[in-house]
Amino acid sequence: MKLSSWFAALVCAFGLVAAGNALAARKTQNEYPNATRSEPRAEMSSADQRDLGKAADYVNEGKDDKAQEYVTKALSRKRSSPYAQSFAHQLQGQIYYDQDKMPEAIAEYRKAIEINGLPNAQHFQVLYIIAQLELQEEDYEGALATVAEWEKLTGTQTADELALKANAYYRLDQYQAAIDAMSKAISMSDKPSDSWSQILMASYFELGQYDQAAALVQQQLAKDPKNMKLINQLATVYIQADQMDKAAAIMTKAKDEGLITSGADYVQLAKLYASADKNKEAAAVMQEGFAKGLIEGNYDNYKLYGDICMQADNDACAIEAYTKASPTAPDGNVDYQLGYALYYADRSQEAI
């Protein structure tokens, strides 16, 4: 992760340019009108301006080795302003991040916060980065504490921040809290991330709230009715809720609309029909999938086909499927089923 545009802008606006420009920057629109933190003075010595300016440029260019020299010089100055010290620790945190030293990066970012010298926008962004890294490092309690600190200081909530909070709650098995936070995040975003819906869906699943899970997918399908991924998700919800008829119905509709084009989808539809005691329909789906070359001709699929045909009382179909499964069978179960099918098809000599 390179320094983002917000950081480059702040470098230019606070302290690394003339004092007049810094004053002008303060007159720009306030991103956090409800902030409870007082804006500190963004000032530093000419030596710190020079060294930290060079360090920031080098970090932006991916030249962390060169940046380190100037960051170290700035950190060694005992009389540097709080802003210079905070900014130097922020740069050091970025260098550690680029080196995949996440605990060290978090520690340096935290020092930048504790010194309390950064302008509000920069301070809040560093705090948010800490929460993101804590989540990444599986310090979920820490991430929640940092997000709470961010909310208190900024006096606001955002969709992204709420989604981060929901993610942490989910990892801590606090599913209702995850649902509440993620539902609010999604409601605040014009284009919520797919991962947000996945976390919300998973939280519903953990609490057995299948109706809510189904409603969530149905809302998404209303906007994108031919999205096979969403259709499969809705079918999965119905399966988990033991509503096999509904699962089979939605997959059948997808098939009728020409949306089922993979072997996996054919197999899933066949299994759904079988679970709903619609074995003839299940056998027909398997037959069609094999005929189109979509279902892979392997042991598992032939065994499934044979089992479905047996349940559909279609001995010829079962015999054909079990015969194809037999050469790669891991045990004698398929051969036993094949013998059973041959016997009841009045082909007892072959069964022996």
Q: Which functions belong to the PLM regions below?
A:
Residues 2-125, 136, 145, 160, ...:
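N-terminal leader/linker segments that initiate helical-solenoid repeat arrays
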Residues 37-44, 75-81, 113-119, 148-156, ...:
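Solenoid-like repeat scaffolds
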Residues 152-257, 261:
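Solenoidal tandem-repeat scaffolds enriched in leucines and small polar residues
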Residues 44-53, 82-89, 119-128, 154-164, ...:
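Generic helix N-cap/helix-start motif at coil->alpha-helix transitions
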